[in-house]
């Protein structure tokens, strides 16, 4: 982080000619093939001559925010490679993985701000270049957060969700926790936040009861409608507290959650929408594209992956009947999953968590 502009590597530009690119084998053009000699290089447009490119490059390298940009770029590189790859690329092995974490970026950002503030201002005399540097740092920062989220173990995510749920339960009287519908309320509360708990809600639950859950229940209601207010403030106080609870838990509207869940179950073989599909889902649900992204990232971890793991366990430990049903009884009230052999796989999952064969 403390490296200065003179210590940063300078990369050759197009205008520096083939001699400057000799050290980069991947950048050297291939030898002429059987299609004849290469055409002569076209002249650069006005403003992109060698002097102009060198001047623009020097302005970027000399910008006060460039060391911070280089730092977050290196953190993204460390986050995308294994320790073996990092050592081979000369990046070193991060100690405990903390070097490329988002928390370490916050610490380095604070240290960088103190250092630069004591020496020179953050911005230059070129507002366009200042905006470019800030936007580049923000984009790389978002990439670093997504990379860290993608590498987070699923058990840690579940423990974090469980801890948050237990804290919510502590806010209510002990008598409310003895309700007979406690397990269903707990499942609905987690489904409203776009996640499905992977543990066993109760002793009588089936193999996939925690995954399918009570999908037909009203979302957005959850725990708040079944717990009486401990105070005597009446309905007005409940109405004041409900928006705060919904905002705390990040509950999506029922219609939006049903639309995204239906799309997910219809595309189980590739359970992540493309950019065009995201835009369509944003229009249909009224959510932001960031909320849609986060919902599908969480759904792939908490819904799709457990289904795949469960199907693998069933495929390894159970025989199959000719109709595709696994040999062994089950009750109609228990959620179940039945798979056909790989040559004739065909199934669908409706919003109630029931499998149907195609």
UniProtKB/Swiss-Prot annotation:
Residue ranges of domain MEIS N-terminal in the record: 96-149
Amino acid composition bias (Pro residues), ranges on this chain: 31-46
GO molecular function, one term: DNA-binding transcription activator activity, RNA polymerase II-specific
Superkingdom per UniProt: Eukaryota
Residue segments, region Disordered: 25-56, 192-251
Pfam families in the cross-refs: Homeobox_KN, Meis_PKNOX_N
Keyword Nucleus among record annotations: yes
The entry's keywords: DNA-binding, Homeobox, Nucleus
Polar residues compositional bias, start-end: 207-219
DNA-binding positions: 245-307
SMART domains for this protein: HOX
Similarity remark: Belongs to the TALE/MEIS homeobox family.
PANTHER family linked: HOMEOBOX PROTEIN TRANSCRIPTION FACTORS (PTHR11850)
Protein name: Putative homeobox protein Meis3-like 2
Taxonomic source organism: Homo sapiens (Human)
Annotated gene: MEIS3P2
């Amino acid at each position: 982080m403390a490296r200065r502009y003179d210590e940063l590597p300078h990369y050759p530009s197009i205008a520096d000619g083939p001699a400057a690119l000799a050290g980069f084998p991947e950048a050297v053009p291939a030898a002429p093939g059987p299609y004849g000699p290469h055409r002569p290089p076209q002249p650069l447009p006005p403003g992109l001559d060698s002097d102009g490119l060198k001047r623009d490059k020097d302005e970027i390298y000399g910008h006060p925010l460039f060391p911070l940009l280089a730092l977050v770029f290196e953190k993204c590189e460390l986050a995308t490679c294994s320790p073996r790859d990092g050592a081979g690329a000369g990046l070193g092995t991060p100690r405990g993985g903390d070097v490329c974490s988002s928390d370490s970026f916050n610490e380095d950002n604070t240290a960088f701000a103190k250092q630069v503030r004591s020496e020179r201002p953050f911005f230059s005399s070129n507002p366009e270049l200042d905006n470019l540097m800030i936007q580049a740092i923000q984009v790389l920062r978002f990439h670093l957060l997504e990379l860290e989220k993608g590498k987070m173990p699923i058990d840690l995510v579940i423990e974090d969700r469980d801890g948050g749920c237990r804290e919510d339960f502590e806010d209510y009287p002990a008598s409310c926790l003895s309700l007979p519908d406690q397990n269903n309320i707990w499942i609905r509360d987690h489904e409203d936040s776009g996640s499905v708990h992977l543990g066993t809600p109760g002793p009588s639950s089936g193999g996939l009861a925690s995954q399918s859950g009570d999908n037909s229940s009203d979302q957005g209601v959850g725990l708040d409608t079944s717990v009486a207010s401990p105070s005597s403030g009446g309905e007005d106080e409940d109405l004041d507290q409900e928006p705060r609870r919904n905002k705390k838990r990040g509950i999506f509207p029922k219609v939006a959650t049903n639309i995204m869940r239906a799309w997910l179950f219809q595309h189980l073989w590739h359970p992540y929408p493309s950019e065009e599909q995201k835009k369509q889902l944003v229009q249909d649900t009224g959510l932001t594209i960031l909320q849609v992204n986060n919902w599908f990232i969480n759904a792939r971890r908490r819904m799709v992956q457990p289904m795949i793991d469960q199907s693998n366990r069933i495929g390894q430990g159970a025989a199959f009947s000719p109709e595709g049903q696994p040999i062994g009884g089950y009750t109609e009230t228990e959620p179940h999953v039945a798979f056909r052999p790989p040559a004739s796989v065909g199934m669908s999952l409706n919003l109630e968590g029931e499998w149907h064969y195609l």
